[in-house]
């Protein structure tokens, strides 16, 4: 009985998340279209995502995030932002916490979600985790963004761990890029 109630509540939570995500996209649609049209507008796209879209989702889901131990990041400098990944809300939290634009490396499958997938594929670096060539492409696309002074956010576990797993083994990509470009790694949790 308890398991059934948990499944029902989690399903309601997931549906509510997607409703809020859709409301966020709908209310900012003209800006998202304009700012996703070119990489040079990415800082403006990120501003909309950070100050409107993520707030609609976070506050609508009942989250009131508090940023502790806040460090000033140097404007115009690239960073490798890494965090563990527990749920869909993690992306909103990363955007909320990082004032300076970050570009996410994310799984390609999400580009199939109607409307959201369009913007996701325009502004994120997508990886098809089962395709070695795609992983190499992520590396070259990340280099391109880092050379422009944009920071990259990677969840080094490579996805959300199974229930009961606290932390999976990290993949090397984020750390290899940080070493190659001699950029600081900023851990968020």
PLM feature spans:
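Soluble catalytic domains of membrane acyltransferases
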Residues: 60-189
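A transmembrane-helix-recognition feature enriched in membrane-embedded lipid enzymes
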Residues: 3-66, 118-122
